[in-house]
């Protein structure tokens, strides 16, 4: 029998909101695998969706800088929230941004090496580990950015200038956390995983096969839209999808990047 620690139960509960005993049972059935336990609970109908699929585990700050032709976003990690607000921690982040803005970024490994002395000095000063976790640049036209409390940062590339709408789209991305630009860009593996879950849930209703297929199809469309920017309802006009808003304003969203402090990413 798999030994399930209290830490694993707490972690699964934080991720799903399900009760302690149900979390423990799921972990035992799935031999301690967190991701499989989430799917197990969903198939049992105990959670409708996983709201914290990209689990937040660290402290730190997001830094962004942008003009119409270049955007740079950095996540600088720390062990505690206190250090993430330290003036020298913030100063290091701004120095890294300034460097990337004026020098072609070869790789994050190069940036880490270039700033290693400053990072080490800060580590000794605050007695915490500091990590240059990730950096993203958008080196194209019509870049807009948004920073929410240094916890969430967004860069958006649009097809033309519309500063007000582009800013609202960036704010929408920060709030709604889409993972993909369009529903057809959702990876096949993600859709297949969700299909298995929805199939299991639908079969519990004991409806006829044609009705089940219709239910599953509707749920899959909804799922793909909910994690895709253009399929989401626009937070500033909830009766319209983002795709409808940009069509009305004759503007396209070409790409976007969203960082949230500590999130799991690939």
Swiss-Prot record:
Key words, A-Z: Cytoplasm, Elongation factor, Protein biosynthesis
InterPro entries: EF-Ts_dimer_sf (IPR036402), Transl_elong_EFTs/EF1B (IPR001816), Transl_elong_EFTs/EF1B_dimer (IPR014039), Transl_elong_Ts_CS (IPR018101), UBA-like_sf (IPR009060)
Disulfide feature: none
One function term, GO molecular function aspect: translation elongation factor activity
Gene Ontology cellular component terms for the protein in this record: cytoplasm
Pfam annotation, one family: EF_TS
Chief site of localization: cytoplasm
Keyword field contains tRNA processing: no
Gene3D superfamilies from the UniProt entry: 1.10.286.20, DNA helicase RuvA subunit, C-terminal domain, Elongation factor Ts, dimerisation domain
Location(s), subcellular: Cytoplasm
Region (Involved in Mg(2+) ion dislocation from EF-Tu): 80-83
KW Amino-acid biosynthesis (keyword) present: no
Function: Associates with the EF-Tu.GDP complex and induces the exchange of GDP to GTP. It remains bound to the aminoacyl-tRNA.EF-Tu.GTP complex up to the GTP hydrolysis stage on the ribosome.
The family this protein is said to belong to: Belongs to the EF-Ts family.
UniProt protein name: Elongation factor Ts
Source organism per UniProt: Buchnera aphidicola subsp. Baizongia pistaciae (strain Bp)
């Amino acid at each position: 029998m798999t030994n399930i620690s209290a830490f694993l139960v707490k972690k699964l509960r934080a991720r799903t909101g399900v009760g302690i005993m149900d979390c423990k049972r799921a972990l035992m059935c799935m031999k301690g695998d967190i991701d499989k336990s989430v799917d197990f609970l969903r198939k049992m109908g105990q959670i409708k969706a996983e709201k914290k699929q990209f689990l937040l585990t660290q402290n730190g700050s997001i830094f962004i800088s942008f003009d119409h032709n270049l955007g740079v976003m950095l996540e600088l990690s720390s062990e505690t929230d206190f250090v993430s607000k330290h003036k020298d921690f913030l100063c290091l982040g701004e120095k890294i941004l300034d460097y990337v803005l004026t020098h072609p970024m070869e790789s994050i490994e190069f940036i880490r090496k270039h700033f290693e002395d400053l990072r080490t000095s800060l580590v000794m000063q605050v007695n915490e580990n500091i990590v240059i976790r990730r950096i993203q640049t958008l080196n194209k036209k019509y870049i807009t950015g948004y920073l929410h409390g240094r916890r969430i940062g967004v860069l958006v590339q649009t097809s033309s200038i519309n500063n007000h709408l582009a800013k609202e789209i960036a704010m929408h991305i920060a709030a709604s956390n889409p993972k993909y630009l369009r529903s057809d860009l959702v990876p096949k593996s993600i859709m297949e995983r969700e299909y298995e879950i929805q199939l299991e849930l639908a079969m519990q209703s004991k409806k006829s096969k044609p009705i089940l297929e219709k239910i599953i199809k509707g749920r899959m469309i909804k799922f793909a839209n909910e994690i895709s920017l253009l399929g989401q309802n626009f937070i500033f006009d909830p009766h319209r999808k983002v795709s409808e808003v940009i069509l009305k304003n004759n503007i396209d969203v070409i790409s976007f990047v969203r960082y949230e402090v500590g999130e799991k990413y690939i």
